[in-house]
Amino acid sequence: MSGLLAAHLLERLGFGVTLLEARERVGGRVFGVAAEDGAHRFDLGPAWVWPELNPRTVDWLSTLGLALFEQQGRGAGLVELPSQAVRRHATGFAQQPPSMRIVGGTARLTDALRARLVRTRVLLGTRVRGLDVCPDGTVGVEFERGGQVGALVASSVILALPPRLLASTLRWSPALPAELSQRWREAPTWMAGHAKLLALYPTPFWRAAGLSGSAVSQAGPLAELHDASDAEGRHAALFGFVGVPAAGRRRLERQALIDASLAQLGRLFGAEAVTPQAVYLQDWAEEVETATPADAAPNSAHPAPMSTDLPAHWRDRIHLAGSEFAPDFPGYLEGAVLAAERAVDALQSQLGSGNKLPGPGQTTEAALPAASRTGSHTGENGGA
């Protein structure tokens, strides 16, 4: 979502913006599937916000008219042992600080940002292939769209991609220093190697049995599970993080993994859980706009924030807005917000606008000349 937010801020400052998106949708790692009535989207990417820790995200949600509700946790929690024996914990699994979810699904956030791009040209299915410093100091952006190669020229470019994709999917001319390129290739993309299974049901039947919908398992294939229903429980669902590493998932038939997950849901929540109305398996390691082969290795720890410093010939021409470049909460929604705001602030300072970066709910009346165009490419952005 960092590319969308950056484009929104730039448009409000009066910049001409072209947003290039490699996918056929916006949002990057923010992705959900719609309920039948379209009133809710079930998250297959990031789902949680922690207001005490994510103040900028909360500010933007408020500005965009989006509300939060607390993750359902009332009722007993379940623990599945390696033997597949299930133990019930009456007190459940309290989350501190409480995890909150966006009413309607996290994709409502990216939908709202997209809807506010009035003058920005948005090109979907447009994959940036290369960046060139032009003799006049502008940046040439080579892209591929519909099997055709194209190019545009921008005064500055904001890149809303994780470090690994910047290093492995883009041609840079002049080339990046080998040390920087290697450092980016070694930087894990948060949650890129993970997979998430979502099962939809007519009702949240587990609640009637006194269960919270939360479980942890040492048997698998799902390692951690939660209630994924909407705030009212009218759109019922369970989701689980797949505990099988990406390399192991590649050796499994997709349907075999789904079948094993449904059997596990039956062990945990009863026979009704085995036959959902619909089931979705989102394997982020298979998304080339998110993951590289290096992301198949499980993360040993949360990635540290990445430096945004660039060599002199790219400095002030390229600005990095991927969530992994955020000073705090890299990889999360909050990181995406912070990285986008910082990148736009740096670009604004570079181009000499006297306008102050507008925060949530603020506007600016001054505008740069239309000739000052800024390209913002987002092929993958967002949170964990």
Each model region followed by its residue ranges:
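Conserved flavin/dinucleotide-binding core of flavoenzymes
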Residues: 4-5, 13, 85-94, 138, ...
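Glycine-rich FAD pyrophosphate-binding loop
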Residues: 11-37
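Generic structural signal for small/hydrophobic residues in well-ordered secondary structure
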Residues: 27, 61, 113, 158, ...
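Glycine-rich active-site loop/strand segments that organize a redox cofactor
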Residues: 28-57, 72-76, 80-83, 87-90
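A short alpha-helix-loop-beta-strand transition element characteristic
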Residues: 41, 56-78, 190, 205-211, ...
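Short beta-strand to alpha-helix junction loop
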Residues: 47-54, 94-114, 123, 253
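A conserved short coil-to-beta-strand element within the FAD-binding core of flavoproteins
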Residues: 124-140
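Central helical "cap/lid" subdomain
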Residues: 145-209, 272
